[in-house]
């Protein structure tokens, strides 16, 4: 656990909460309120990004024949490494930042025991088409794309750490804005000394059943989905295996607030890539969210997410640790447009998750034509 990072996260989240409260205080006039549901974020961690992970169920009510197109863009920065890699970089740099090269790959692979480093930024783009067949049944198709780069956020993150007076958690050991991955565990070896080619990832087909067609106080939503492997395995793009699973979501609505709880179970087919765990496993996940009105058309959202690591074949406890993420955001409904903006931070466990992620989502609803 990295207590200084936890402190930085707490400061950032507290600042956002204060901002939300200030906005809410400016608009106390009673008016109709629209509940939208949780932020549509899936697992963004570099060690689980290829598996199918359910997006938490939205709470937008639609009539039969309604279409919707939803574009979600998430961008995350990851900088994690094992203790022996940190010791190596510290010794090599001698107080200066290291520019990764092939000699570092060889040196890390030669370290005794298991070792890993993941330094880079990942963009996840999800395009989802929704359709409502009946008052209760709907379906969706999500087509994701993944992109990798050395990025641009390292300086911003380090500056924020300095601003709030916390440590850099080994960020001072390497030059900024590089992409570098070396993973040496019992599963094998995976090496990238530059950003890999991104591209279209495996699509997800899902069906959704809403128990209450037009919910006023509560709703229960059941979903089933499959992620077929439509291509051969490709590192950081496709697992080459098929995943499938189910999700159950409870939704409770109040005057200007709503609570959401989603639980899912996914049969993860593993990854057909050398250096990554191959084993099939059942991966549960839980999302809890609180939505509250802030203004005329804007809501705030606080969201918590947890799921176990898919990495099992290692002696490094930090890679096997359960992941905990928190998201804070704002979202709104403007005519037939739904927009969401959120920041996601890691909690409790830090060595197998992204340091920070930002998500922007825009959806356009196409109601059925009146006859």
Residue locations for each model-derived region?
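Outer-membrane beta-barrel biogenesis signature
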Residues: 23-104, 368-371
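Detector for outer-membrane/organellar transmembrane beta-barrel domains
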Residues: 65-67, 72, 77-80, 237-312
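Transmembrane beta-strands of outer-membrane beta-barrel proteins
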Residues: 67-71, 139-141, 205, 218-224, ...
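Outer-membrane beta-barrel pore domains and translocons
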Residues: 72-76, 144-146, 210, 225-229, ...
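Residue-level signature of outer-membrane beta-barrel architecture
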Residues: 73, 131, 143, 209-211, ...
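Outer membrane beta-barrel transmembrane domains
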Residues: 89-92, 162-189, 276-371
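Outer-membrane pore/translocation modules
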Residues: 144-281, 317, 333
């Amino acid at each position: 656990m990295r207590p200084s990072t936890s402190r930085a996260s707490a400061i950032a989240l507290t600042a956002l909460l204060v901002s939300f409260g200030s906005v809410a205080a400016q608009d106390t006039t009673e008016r109709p309120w629209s509940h939208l549901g949780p932020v549509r974020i899936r697992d963004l961690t570099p060690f689980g990004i290829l598996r199918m992970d359910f997006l938490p169920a939205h709470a937008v009510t639609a009539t039969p024949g309604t279409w919707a197109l939803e574009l979600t863009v998430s961008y995350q920065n990851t900088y994690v490494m094992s203790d022996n890699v940190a010791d190596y970089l510290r010794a090599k740099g001698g107080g200066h930042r290291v520019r990764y090269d092939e000699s570092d790959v060889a040196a890390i692979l030669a370290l005794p025991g298991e070792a890993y480093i993941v330094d880079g930024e990942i963009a996840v783009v999800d395009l989802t088409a929704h359709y409502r067949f009946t008052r209760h049944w709907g379906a969706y198709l999500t087509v994701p794309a993944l992109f990798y780069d050395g990025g641009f956020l390292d300086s911003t993150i380090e500056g924020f750490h300095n601003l709030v007076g916390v440590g850099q958690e080994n960020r001072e050991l390497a030059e900024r804005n590089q992409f570098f991955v070396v993973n040496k565990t019992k599963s094998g070896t995976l090496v990238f000394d530059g950003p890999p080619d991104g591209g279209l990832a495996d699509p997800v087909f899902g069906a959704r059943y809403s128990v209450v067609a037009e919910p006023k106080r509560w709703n229960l939503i059941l979903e089933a989905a499959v992620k077929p492997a439509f291509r051969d395995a490709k590192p950081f793009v496709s697992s080459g295996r098929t995943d499938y699973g189910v999700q159950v979501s409870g939704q409770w609505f109040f005057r200007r607030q709503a609570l959401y709880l989603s639980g899912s179970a996914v049969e993860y087919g593993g990854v057909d890539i050398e250096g990554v765990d191959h084993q099939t496993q059942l991966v549960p996940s839980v999302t809890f969210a609180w939505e509250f009105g802030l203004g005329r058309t804007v809501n705030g959202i606080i969201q918590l997410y947890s799921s176990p690591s898919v990495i099992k074949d290692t002696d490094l406890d930090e890679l096997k640790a359960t992941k905990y993420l928190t998201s804070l955001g704002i979202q709104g409904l403007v005519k037939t447009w739904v927009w969401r903006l959120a920041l996601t931070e890691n909690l409790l466990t830090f060595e197998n998750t992204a340091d920070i992620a930002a998500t922007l989502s825009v959806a356009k609803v196409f109601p059925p034509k009146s006859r």
